[in-house]
């Protein structure tokens, strides 16, 4: 495989390996095999010990020092396992995300009331989601920002028993509405709930045939005058995992919308669309759209994807290329070298003179 097949990873990993026991377990667990299984068990035990002793800060520091996306994913998998209900007394928390693509001519708001009865009734119809219909649902929806402010230590305390769960639920912020900016926007909202250990088996599974009915529940519950809305339901999962999945899907759908709009506007004035893909220092991917010929160039249209610690660049890149293929765009330039943190992305006519290749016709091996 060519080193230039995928966009380079510019996330700021530590320059030197950090010799922390937690990180060493994570790296070994990521490698798999018999030793990897032992390391994964040790990793879970250590995270459990940290959270039991209220040492969340140590875990947070270790997560910030992970040397790779793979190691970070291994640590998060261990954390999500620790946050699961393990006994009949413990509580299983879950989040049910929905991605909202909205359009409005002026700033607006959606209701933040969770459609709990409708969600429960819908999920009760399918064996793989039925247990969620017996859960306790919180009466309101939460934003991604609000979910991200809850740390693993708080989730760990809230799972100890029913009393702790109810106390935690009562302490969460109250929302009257979910604000929308003027124009098009893509955001995530979350329904939260909790129940017994039986819920664990429902988490992280594909919605399958429940997806369309669930979408209809969200559409009806969140519709508002003057707002064009499309709701994309995601699978229920533990709150940290749901936050990660929703963050990725929100950006993916935002990029889809931006791409379609950009291609449409360029084709109104130029016969050929040129697309530039690049990494940017500081952990970002940048996608630019313009005419292929400099004499037809328009105002640059650029989308920036800030990479989360668990984003897989190869997946982001392939999803984008699949979308371009659907839009019948063939003039693509993937730049081999990252652009500077404060540099503008070159236009297509500039990019073809820089080291790079068209990923539709090779992996950059001979470019």
Tell me what each language-model feature is.
Residues 363-367:
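Cysteine-rich micro-motifs
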């Amino acid at each position: 495989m060519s080193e230039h097949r995928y966009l380079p990873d510019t996330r700021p990993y530590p320059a030197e390996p950090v010799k922390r026991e937690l990180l060493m377990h994570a790296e070994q667990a990521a490698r798999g095999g018999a030793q990897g299984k032992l390391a994964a068990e040790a990793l879970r035990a250590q995270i459990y010990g940290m959270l039991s002793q209220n040492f969340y800060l140590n875990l947070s520091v270790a997560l910030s020092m992970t040397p790779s996306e793979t190691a970070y994913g291994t640590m998060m998998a261990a954390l999500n396992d620790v946050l699961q209900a393990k006994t009949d007394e413990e509580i299983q928390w879950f989040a049910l995300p929905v991605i909202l693509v909205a359009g409005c001519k002026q700033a607006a708001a959606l209701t933040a009331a969770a459609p709990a009865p409708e969600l429960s009734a819908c999920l009760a119809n399918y064996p793989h989601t039925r247990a969620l219909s017996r859960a306790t649902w919180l009466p309101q929806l939460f934003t991604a920002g609000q979910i991200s402010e809850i740390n693993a230590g708080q989730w760990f305390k809230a799972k100890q028993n029913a009393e702790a769960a109810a106390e935690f639920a009562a302490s969460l912020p109250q929302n009257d509405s979910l604000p929308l900016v003027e124009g098009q926007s893509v955001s995530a909202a979350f329904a939260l709930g909790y129940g017994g250990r039986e819920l664990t088996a429902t988490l992280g599974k594909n919605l399958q045939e429940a997806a369309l009915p669930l979408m209809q529940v969200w559409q009806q519950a969140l519709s508002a005058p003057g707002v064009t809305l499309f709701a994309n339901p995601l699978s229920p999962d533990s709150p940290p995992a749901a936050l990660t999945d929703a963050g990725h899907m929100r950006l993916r759908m935002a990029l889809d919308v931006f791409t379609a709009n950009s291609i449409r506007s360029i084709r109104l004035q130029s016969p050929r669309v040129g697309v530039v893909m690049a990494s940017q220092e500081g952990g970002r991917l940048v996608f630019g759209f313009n005419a292929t010929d400099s004499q037809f160039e328009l105002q640059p249209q650029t989308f920036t994807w800030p990479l989360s610690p668990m984003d897989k660049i190869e997946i982001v890149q392939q999803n984008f290329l699949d979308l371009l293929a659907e839009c019948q765009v063939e003039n693509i330039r993937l730049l081999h070298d990252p652009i500077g943190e404060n540099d503008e992305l070159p236009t297509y006519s500039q990019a073809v003179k820089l080291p790079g290749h068209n990923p539709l016709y090779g992996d950059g091996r001979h470019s």
